[in-house]
Amino acid sequence: MGRFTRRGFVAAASTVAGNLLLSKRSGQAQALSNSKKASHPGSDLKLWYTSPASQWVDALPIGNGRLGAMVFGGGATKPVDAKDSAADHAAGPVPTDPAKETLVLNEDTLWSGLPVDGNNLDAKQYLTAVRQAVLDQKDYHLADQICHKMQGLFAEAYQPIGSLHVDCTHSGAVTGYRRELDLASATVTTRYKVDDVEYERSAFASAPDRAIVLRISASKPGQLHATIWAAGALVKSVQTIGSNRLLLTGKAAKHIAGAGHPGSEIPVVHSDVPGEGMYYAAITEVKTEGGQIAAHEGKLLIQGATTCTLLLTVTTGYRSFDQKPDMSQDEVSQRASRQLDAAATRTYSDLVRRHVEDYRRFFDRVTLSLGPDKTDSNTAASQPTDERLKNFAAAPDPSLLALYFQYGRYLLISSSRPGTQPANLQGIWNYQVQPPWSCNWTSNINIQMNYWPAESCNLTECTEPLLAFIADLSHTGARAARETYGLPGWVSHHNIDLWRAANPVGTGVGSPTWANWSMSGPWLCGHLYEHYRFTRDREFLRTRAYPLMKGSAEFCLAWLIEDGNGHLTTCPSESTENDFMAPDGKPAMTSAGCTMDMALIRELFTNCILSAKELGVDEVFAAKLDAARSRLIPYQVGKFGQLQEWAIDFEESTPGQRHMSHMYPLYPGSEITPRGTPQLAKAARVSLERRLANGGAYTGWSRAWAIAFWSRLGDGDKAWESLSMLMQHSTNVNLFDTHPAGKTSIFQIDGNFGATAAIAEMLMQSHTGVIDLLPALPVAWPAGEVKGLKARGAVEVGLRWEQGKAVSAMIRPDFSGEYQLRAPEGQKIESISNGSSVPQRTLSDGSVACRLTAKRTYRVSFA
């Protein structure tokens, strides 16, 4: 992994005339930003700081779904050796110069490797043996050993493009420094002053123009002097094209060993053979107004300009998950040049306008205020974000939580768009060649959590990459089912890469609790059906969702076996990443019929049965699913009063495990609810309390899950307590979620997304078919307003509350029909109207039913 190199400024001259200042255009962009702020009254939508980022994890992210960049707002003050570890510089901290700029770049298809069959072809011969070890011999340790023999190859790793640097030189000292990320315009801006000249840098990632844009301006003519250069650990060459273009080319590794995984593999394997690792190209065009621009020794040199605009595009040799990435370097570079040519035809003001308009059509759908609007200089929003975070424990800051909520939506918009790859463990942002957990799609909760907020937070289009991903996975998963287990349908495990690896990974040394867990297919299929529930898109259900769900159900139906007690069970079965204490008092991993397996299969079968009925198909198959569903091991309450994690009431070897897989039917599932299954809800609460009492939820994503659990249990104050813990202990200064890893913390984006979804759950729930309003409102949020949340049934919901009580709600369905609403605890729905009162009837569960007309907005009042 290479550090980011920089060389000294080399004087050169090549005159390029420039006559027009861009202050007018800059003003147009600012006007767009101001109009955006006006559309979010009472909202605080900026992360801002008074010093540059001194390490990668403190930089500010921009992205268009495909391209991503971390914007430092500064650059290293001294040269760094490109051959040394990138982590030493990028993970820092290192001294930074605010007059410089650093963008660490990513493109969502740059991965190591190529399509391979990672299945262990000897695996299926061990399936009977592992089942006998568990069910007949009760030898769980032997079962663990056999599971190792069923493991295949590790997945590949997400790779960094490199870094782009702009080193400005000034004769005086920098004062008045500020860098910010404005969620209203998806733009990172850095401002400072040198003597009487004000400097500004603005960066954004445009989806419509498929480019990253960096604009640098001075308030007085001729005051910009800069060197533009690029570097990276995988970079093969950096060269200039003409006097104003910089071309960076490189090649991803043939193979990357999983960071932190056991084994003796060479960590990084490079190859010069075409198709063994993909080529990539990043090309930057520089336009100046005023001054001179010259190319010299792989750098671009700017002298005496007033503005400087950089356009950057990136392409890779990726073709498809099932095709070798054998595109030549020349072809990849030409594709990048064509993309840049298209973007370069637009003026800067057009680039800004198109970017902001595109972004706002997603972001503007939801607004959230968790307190009265305050505009005086003493409000928390007037403090830098790192200070607000530091002060959170002593001075709880509801507006910071509203900002955090919107930041999660921003990150999803920036990392997942139709046509892109899904958001991975770090979204689309990564600086390491060998990143933690390969920066892949870990599917025993992480990729699923990434998409928890997509539907409820009104970003349904952002789920499209996940839906397409599942379709791809069904192909490799069918091969995994056949070659690993000798079974029909499709299966996937916990570790998936660009090539859609579906096999159990580990190469014989992986822990069975993650390597041999085989239930990610049913979990991912839950997202297919949830997308249908939120959108009511019947054509999607018929042509895309149901066929994939059916394939997963076919595997599960064949995977189930008799347990000897009249039930159907799964074996081998793992409760994700948690061991249990075997009868001999030693930890073991592999058993039969873990609670999560039963929950996922029961949910999948139910969704398939409902879909088949809705579509009028597969009556016989649905009947088979129904018969099998009735024989699944039921949920059980253990000796501590807890929801059992395993079919046998084992004790956990790690009572504070961050994974809480047996709680799936509470959230994100919907089988356990306080009203519908009160005894099981009580047991789930005991399980949650035991986990937290033993130090559980120590990672950001696990804490986010706890917030969602408390929300589903209707305990707003406990949800707030966990949310507060997340802000204090699992949130970085740039509001990235963190995962503790020894002496340092690792960025993992799932906690951001999980917490955003959990906040939405505190304000509105719809998983039972009833739209529950303010189901888990904490005392800490006595007043507030939310607009634009989405409920299942394709209903948009807004709410306003004061003194802890709902004042009004706005309901807008996409379809005509009957809907059920429930008032907050202690209140009742007084009226529902759309110009005239809508008849309503109270049901036995306390909710009210009413018929609503599509595309009309209804006002709900409360008593």
Can you name each region flagged by the protein language model?
Residues 813-823:
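Short, surface-exposed polybasic-and-hydrophobic patches located at secondary-structure transitions
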Residues 57-81, 86, 91-104, 109-110, ...:
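C-terminal capping/lid segments that line or modulate ligand- or cofactor-binding pockets
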Residues 311, 358, 469, 527, ...:
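Generic recognition of well-ordered alpha-helical segments
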Residues 34-512, 530-532, 542, 550-553, ...:
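Aromatic-residue-lined binding/catalytic grooves and analogous aromatic/hydrophobic interfacial grooves
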Residues 2-3, 7-29:
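N-terminal export signals
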Residues 537-538:
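Short loop-to-helix capping motifs
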Residues 520-531, 544-557, 702, 719, ...:
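Extended, hydrophobic alpha-helical segments in both membrane/secreted and soluble proteins
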